[in-house]
Curated annotation (Swiss-Prot):
Residues 7-88, 95-174, 380-458 form the RRM domain. It comes from the Eukaryota. One of its GO terms (molecular function) is 7SK snRNA binding. Belongs to the CELF/BRUNOL family. It comes from Mus musculus. The lineage of its organism: Eukaryota, Metazoa, Chordata, Craniata, Vertebrata. Transmembrane segments: none annotated. It holds the Pfam family RRM_1. This is CUGBP Elav-like family member 3.
Length: 465
């Protein structure tokens, strides 16, 4: 039976061929094991070289940590084993955030409110520079069970005098959660993250790809809209109009049996709102047929593609998928889930015969060269140091996409342990995006560290001539 205050341990630096039955003899000498689980990739099922361990008794966990952490190196590993409380324990589900307090309540008032649930290590009401209460506090118990009991009893249980809503009691955020939230706030201030893209994931990949084009334009601080940028903006307006009517809110799955969700079928084209102007340009007026007015003026001479008339209905999701094809080569992992969700359009022309072997070989060589070209031009590649240990390629891609079109984003990983080295690189397709990323993210704090973002030196920078 597990004790209420038992500690969940994270075990790292273990060989990938060792399963639970192989690891148990190492840890059973310190006490009875309640649960031991090797962590595996949820998609591939591959061993990740780490595990979670929970003893029945708290003392057993402390003994194991004291005897093994950084003390013993398992066969086949270059670094000693890591045994420490898991993230949820170290933060550790003992510290509570208390919101919607009255402005007049003191530390002692809050302590009296929470004392019935256990021993309190810390109790602090947050105050501004002038000493005025911010209406919230942090309370830290000795055990997770005590903190959980306080949440179960007090959360939303009452409205305190001077508060505008019921009492809020929840576990405090981790450093990682606060860091990610600040990154999202920075991106929101830059006006480059789409809430639609963040909410609907793979179904909005087309929108995210178009946003990269717009982000690069913003990073360059250019007031002139090029024809290609104007086209991207018009396309983004079209997608925003579709999303505003809830057309992307219903996921399409292969089992649904239809390529058009009910929201699309029930929404007439005339109900789609007019798109907003781009950088001061007014939206192009349209006739009832869906075609642009004959006297309309277009920025840079680029005609926006109008919504389809009722006489020729086209699935807007299928349009999005068709327009997304040329982005899939750059980010295959990001779009791998999209293809099954969108049915393939019917062939409009007869199937072409396969190219001759010589042409196939040339195409394969070109594809290999494109895959090998991971870096952008000189002045477009940046290094990022002091990354959190848990950050992967997808996290730094999400972090730097707002600044422009990303060619590649990579976190360096130790080949022996498959653990992050806490630094990586990002390549853009233009210097302006790289400089904008450096200015915004260099010195950005995540947890206890600040990111160091700098430009990679050109290949010939060290040459004396």
């Amino acid at each position: 039976m597990k004790e209420p205050d038992a500690i969940k341990l994270f075990v790292g630096q273990i060989p990938r061929h060792l399963e639970e039955k192989d690891l148990k003899p190492i840890f059973e000498q310190f006490g009875r094991i309640f649960e031991l689980t090797v962590i595996k990739d949820k998609y591939t099922g591959l061993h990740k070289g780490c595990a979670f361990l929970t003893y029945c008794a708290r003392d057993s966990a402390l003994k194991a940590q004291s005897a093994l952490h950084e003390q013993k190196t398992l066969p086949g590993m270059n670094r000693p084993i890591q045994v420490k409380p898991a993230d949820s324990e170290s933060r550790g589900d003992r510290k509570l955030f208390v919101g919607m307090l009255g402005k007049q309540q003191t530390d002692e008032d809050v302590r009296k409110m929470f004392e019935p649930f256990g021993t309190i290590d810390e109790c602090t009401v947050l105050r501004g520079p002038d000493g005025t209460s911010k209406g919230c506090a942090f309370v830290k118990f000795q055990t997770h069970a005590e903190a959980q009991a306080a949440i179960n009893t007090l959360h939303s249980s009452r409205t305190l005098p001077g508060a505008s809503s019921s009492l809020v009691v929840k576990f405090a955020d981790t450093e990682k959660e606060r860091g990610l939230r600040r990154m999202q706030q920075v991106a929101t201030q830059l006006g480059m993250f789409s809430p639609i893209a963040l909410q609907f994931g793979a179904y909005s990949a087309y929108t995210q790809a178009l946003m990269q084009q717009q982000a690069a334009l913003v990073a360059a601080h250019s007031a002139y809209l090029s024809p290609m940028a104007t086209m991207a903006a018009v396309q983004m307006q079209h997608m925003a109009a579709i999303s505003a009517n809830g057309l992307i809110a219903t996921p399409i799955t292969p089992s649904s049996g239809t390529s058009t969700p009910p929201a699309i079928a029930a929404t007439p084209v005339s109900a789609i709102p007019a798109a907003l102007g781009v950088n001061g340009y007014s939206p192009v007026p349209t006739q009832p047929t869906g075609q642009p007015a004959p006297d309309a003026l277009y920025p840079n001479g680029v005609h926006p593609y109008p919504a389809q008339s009722p006489a020729a209905p086209v699935d807007p999701l299928q349009q999005a998928y068709a327009g997304m094809q040329h982005y899939t080569a750059a980010y295959p992992a990001a779009y791998s889930l999209v293809a099954p969700a969108f049915p393939q359009p019917p062939a409009l022309v007869a199937q072409q015969p396969p190219p001759p072997p010589q042409q196939q070989q040339q195409q394969q060589q070109q594809q290999q060269q494109q895959q090998q070209q991971r870096e952008g031009p000189d002045g477009c590649n940046i290094f990022i140091y002091h990354l959190p240990q848990e950050f992967t390629d997808s996290e730094i891609l999400q972090m730097f996409v707002p600044f422009g079109h990303v060619i590649s984003a990579k976190v360096f990983v130790d080949r022996a342990t498959n653990q992050s080295k806490c630094f990586g690189f990002v390549s853009f397709d233009n210097p302006a995006s790289a400089q904008a990323a450096i200015q915004a993210m260099n010195g950005f704090q995540i947890g206890m560290k600040r990111l160091k973002v700098q430009l990679k030196r050109p290949k010939d920078a060290n040459r004396p001539y």
